[in-house]
C-alpha cells in the first residue's frame, strides 16, 4: 500500500493522471489544497509526496506564508527516504529544497514540445523513447541539484527531468496531462501565453490533446518504478 499526499497550489493544476494511476491500484490519495488552507501533511501521513505546479515561483517565500514550510517538508521527506515526485513548480521546489538555484529561463515554454532523454542510464527512465512530447507550461527553470542525475532536456530548457536516487523525481514538464487537466490549465492560465517562439496558442494546444494518450503509458511506467509497485502490486 502506498499512501499518497498531493500538494496542490492552484485550483486548475490537479494531480490528473497521477490520481488516475493511484486509483487504479487502490492507493489512498489525499490532496492538500494550499490555495484554500495552508495545511501541510506530517511525514507520518504519507509514503509518497507529490508536489504539483502553479503560477507562483519557488522563490516566493516572503509572499506566500506556506511556501517556506512546504520546501522544508519536501527536504525532510527526501531526507527520510520518502518517495517524492515534483511536477513543474513541484520540480523547482524539489531543486530549491536541495539547494539549487531557481530562476527565470531564457523564454517561456508553453505547449507541446519534445524532450530528449539524456545520455546514460537510469532505472526511472530506461526504456522510455529517446524523445517524447509532453505539455510544458513554465517560465522559470533551475540548476541541477548536487547529486542529482539529469534525465531529460529540451531545446531551450537544460533541466527538464532529474532524479535523486530512485525515489525522488522532478519533472519540469507535465507528463500527467489529461484532456481535462489541459482544458483546466487553459481556462485558468491562458492569459500567461504570449507570442514567443515556444509559446503555443490555445487552439494549437487543444489540437495536441492526443499526446495525453501517448504520455499515459510512460507515466505509468515511471510511477511504477518510482514507487516500486508493479501493475499488479497493491
Which ranges hold each PLM region?
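Cysteine-nucleophile active-site neighborhood
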Residues: 51-122
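Short amphipathic alpha-helical segments
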Residues: 18-20, 61-64, 98-99, 147-148, ...
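C-terminal helical/coil "lid" or tail adjacent to the Rossmann-like core of SAM-dependent
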Residues: 167-168, 172-205
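Short aromatic-enriched loop/helix-cap "lid" or pocket-rim segments at secondary-structure transitions
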Residues: 18, 43-44, 162-164, 181-185
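Pocket-forming structural segment of enzyme catalytic cores
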Residues: 98-180
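N-terminal beta1-alpha1 cap of cysteine-dependent amidohydrolase-like domains
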Residues: 1-82, 194-234
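Glycine-rich, phosphate-binding/catalytic loops in enzymes
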Residues: 21-24, 65-69, 102-103, 153, ...
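Hydrophobic/aromatic beta-strand patches that form the interior of the parallel beta-sheet core
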Residues: 5, 30-32, 50, 85, ...
Amino acid at each position: 500500500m502506498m499512501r499518497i499526499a498531493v500538494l496542490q497550489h492552484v485550483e486548475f493544476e490537479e494531480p490528473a493522471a497521477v490520481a488516475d494511476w493511484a486509483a487504479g491500484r487502490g492507493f489512498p490519495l489525499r490532496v492538500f489544497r494550499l490555495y484554500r488552507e495552508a495545511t501541510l501533511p506530517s511525514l507520518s501521513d504519507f509514503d509518497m509526496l507529490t508536489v504539483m505546479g502553479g503560477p507562483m515561483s519557488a522563490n516566493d517565500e516572503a509572499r506566500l506564508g506556506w511556501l517556506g514550510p512546504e520546501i522544508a517538508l519536501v527536504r525532510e521527506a527526501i531526507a527520510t527516504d520518502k518517495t517524492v515526485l515534483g511536477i513543474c513548480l513541484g520540480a523547482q521546489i524539489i531543486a530549491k529544497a536541495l539547494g539549487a538555484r531557481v530562476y527565470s529561463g531564457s523564454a517561456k515554454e508553453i505547449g507541446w514540445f519534445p524532450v530528449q532523454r539524456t545520455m546514460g542510464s537510469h532505472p526511472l527512465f530506461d526504456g522510455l523513447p529517446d524523445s517524447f512530447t509532453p505539455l510544458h507550461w513554465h517560465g522559470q527553470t533551475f540548476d541541477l541539484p548536487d547529486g542529482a542525475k539529469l534525465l531529460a532536456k529540451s531545446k531551450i530548457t537544460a533541466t527538464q527531468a532529474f532524479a535523486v536516487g530512485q525515489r525522488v523525481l522532478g519533472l519540469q514538464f507535465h507528463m500527467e496531462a489529461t484532456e481535462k487537466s489541459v482544458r483546466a490549465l487553459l481556462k485558468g492560465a491562458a492569459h500567461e501565453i504570449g507570442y514567443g517562439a515556444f509559446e503555443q496558442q490555445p487552439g494549437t494546444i487543444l489540437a495536441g490533446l492526443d499526446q495525453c494518450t501517448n504520455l499515459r503509458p510512460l507515466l505509468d511506467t515511471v510511477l511504477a518504478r518510482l514507487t516500486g509497485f508493479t501493475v499488479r502490486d497493491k
